[in-house]
Amino acid sequence: MNPDIVNLESNLNGEGLRIGVVMARFNLPVCEGLRDACLDELLALGVEPTDITFVTVPGALEIPLALQAMAQNEDDSYDALVALGAVIRGETYHFELVSNEAGAALTRVGLDFDIPVANGVLTCDTDEQAEARMAEKGRDCARCAVEMANLQKAFYD
């Protein structure tokens, strides 16, 4: 790459970052796997335990409202937010509805409030697929939140 090009490198240093995490309780065993992997990775990246706020909500459709409340809370500001949940296909159209609406709402929170939102809401056909993906997806969301928080800071500093 041309050395004159401004290149903002990936930064996975979580020191000093405040992260909000919202987890759905529906499909709880999978969500707990996502949670454990995400929180462990946030700590491994240097985020202090006291700089992590963790909240649970009933299901995936409730996650965006909780994230929105975190995003607009000026007294307790966050650098990034994480959504964790699991939507597993059933026999009705409900799977598509929940998956699509939750995903769109998570994106809207990030854009409306100018805050990174890591989407860790798994959408899988089976419990087995969700269980196979939960650990890596949880870690990935932690890395995404830290990297994007640092990128936002680089843009605005």
From Swiss-Prot:
Biological pathway: Cofactor biosynthesis; riboflavin biosynthesis; riboflavin from 2-hydroxy-3-oxobutyl phosphate and 5-amino-6-(D-ribitylamino)uracil: step 1/2
GO annotation (BP), single: riboflavin biosynthetic process
Uppermost EC category: transferase
Listed EC numbers: 2.5.1.78
UniProt: (2S)-2-hydroxy-3-oxobutyl phosphate binding residues: E91, T92, R133
A GO cellular-component term linked to this record: riboflavin synthase complex
Keywords assigned: Riboflavin biosynthesis, Transferase
Binding of 5-amino-6-(D-ribitylamino)uracil, residues: F26, A60, L61, E62, A86, V87, I88, N119
Active site: H94 (proton donor)
Gene3D superfamilies: Lumazine/riboflavin synthase
UniProt superkingdom: Bacteria
Annotated GO MF terms: 6,7-dimethyl-8-ribityllumazine synthase activity
InterPro entries: LS, LS/RS, LS/RS_sf
NCBIfam families: lumazine-synth
Function in brief: Catalyzes the formation of 6,7-dimethyl-8-ribityllumazine by condensation of 5-amino-6-(D-ribitylamino)uracil with 3,4-dihydroxy-2-butanone 4-phosphate. This is the penultimate step in the biosynthesis of riboflavin.
Protein name: 6,7-dimethyl-8-ribityllumazine synthase
Native species: Laribacter hongkongensis (strain HLHK9)
Gene: ribH
